[in-house]
Amino acid sequence: DSCQDVKQSLADCLMYVTGRALKPA
């Protein structure tokens, strides 16, 4: 699951990246 997978929704992509930034694995 990556930003490229949710390219259909830029908002989802942003939230995905934000979530990763807030919770670094």
Curated annotation (Swiss-Prot):
Keyword terms: Antibiotic, Antimicrobial, Disulfide bond, Fungicide, Lipid-binding, Plant defense, Transport
GO biological process, one term: defense response to bacterium
Tissue: Detected in seeds (at protein level).
GO molecular function ontology, one term from the record: lipid binding
Function according to Swiss-Prot or TrEMBL: Plant non-specific lipid-transfer proteins transfer phospholipids as well as galactolipids across membranes. May play a role in wax or cutin deposition in the cell walls of expanding epidermal cells and certain secretory tissues. Has antibacterial and antifungal activity. Inhibits the growth of P.infestans.
Family named by the database record: Belongs to the plant LTP family.
Protein's name in the database: Non-specific lipid-transfer protein 2
Naturally occurring in which organism (per UniProt): Nigella sativa (Black cumin)
